[in-house]
UniProtKB/Swiss-Prot annotation:
Binds 1 heme group per subunit. This is Heme-containing CO-sensing transcriptional regulator RcoM 2. One of its GO terms (molecular function) is metal ion binding. It is found in: Cytoplasm. The keyword DNA-binding applies. Coiled coil: none annotated. Its main location: cytoplasm. Its cofactor is heme. This protein undergoes a ligand switch upon reduction; the heme distal ligand is coordinated by a Cys residue in the inactive Fe(3+) (ferric) form, by Met-104 in the inactive Fe(2+) (ferrous) form, and by CO in the CO-bound active form. The keyword Glycosyltransferase does not apply. Residues 15-86 form the PAS domain. InterPro entries: LytR-like, LytTR_DNA-bd_dom, PAS-like_dom_sf. Keywords: Activator, Cytoplasm, DNA-binding, Heme, Iron, Metal-binding, Repeat, Transcription, Transcription regulation.
Length: 267
């Protein structure tokens, strides 16, 4: 058993190293920010991705984006998360050391970005920030099948989830995920043997998962139906036992019970 676990861990490490190498080959988006978080400059990658977001969500032409609060270029539901990232300091209180990257979904255009913010310091102290991001959309998603006659493009379908662990970004295969548990702006991703913390919200994930496989059974829980073990009824409530290491009992809301039973083929 130990040898198989060791082999699995080694394979996972190799995948992480391969992805890390790919990430290093990317041309990153770079945004210079003043001390108030307003845009001073973009590189071409950042302008290509964030420019359309500003035009479509704010009605601001690309040449008028300079001086704008960078938080306004992101979806409203992501703004508190990004604002926290921009204002964060190192746990030891150092204003220059920066927090780990976060994954963020940008709906206009439909992109997944890994964002890192680094504080910049000069002779007079902190003088602004540099926001660096990598567009990992093509490594983590694929186009959704579009119903005939649909006027609004469907969100891209996820097949991997980017997370940050041990000073590196790794990708979790969706097929290995047993369940997702939401907690505010963050989500715990649970596999058979591991737990990972993601900055993607359950709402972001739900839009981009196959609804025939992944079901939001509760406001705080999305489950992968192939990993469902047993439905347990307790008084007036129903729990779903999942095949993770703890055999976790996930609460099922009343509004989802009938749909869950139908998908599981339970009478």
């Amino acid at each position: 058993m130990k040898s198989s676990e060791s082999a699995a861990a080694t394979a996972s490490e190799r995948r992480a190293e391969t992805f890390q190498h790919k990430l290093e080959q990317f041309n990153p988006g770079i945004v210079w920010l003043d001390p108030q978080g307003h845009v001073s400059a973009f590189n071409d990658v950042a302008l290509h991705i964030l420019g359309p977001a500003g035009e479509q969500s704010l009605g601001v032409a690309q040449d008028h984006l300079f001086g704008i609060d960078v938080v306004q270029l992101h979806p409203e539901k992501s703004r508190d998360k990004l604002r926290f990232l921009l204002q964060s300091r190192d746990a030891g209180g150092c204003p220059v050391r920066s927090p780990p990257p976060v994954a963020m979904m940008i709906n206009i255009p439909d992109r997944i970005l890994m964002i890192k913010v680094s504080k910049m310091t000069g002779a007079a102290g902190t003088c602004g920030s540099c926001m660096i991001f990598y567009d990992v959309t093509d490594l983590t998603t694929e186009p959704s099948s579009q119903p005939a006659g649909a006027s609004v493009p469907a969100p891209r379908r996820l097949f991997k989830i980017p997370v940050y662990r041990k000073s590196r970004v790794i990708l979790i295969d969706l097929k290995d995920i047993v369940r997702f548990q939401g907690d505010g702006h963050y989500t715990t991703i649970v596999t058979k043997d591991e737990r990972y913390l993601s900055n993607l919200s359950l709402a972001d994930l739900e839009l981009r998962l196959d609804s025939s496989v992944y079901l939001r059974v509760h406001r705080s829980h999305i489950v992968s139906l192939p990993y469902a073990v047993e439905l347990v009824k307790l008084d007036e409530s129903v729990n779903l036992v999942m095949d993770d290491a703890e055999q976790t009992q996930v609460p099922v809301s009343r509004s989802r019970t009938a749909q869950l039973k139908e998908l599981l083929g339970v009478v």
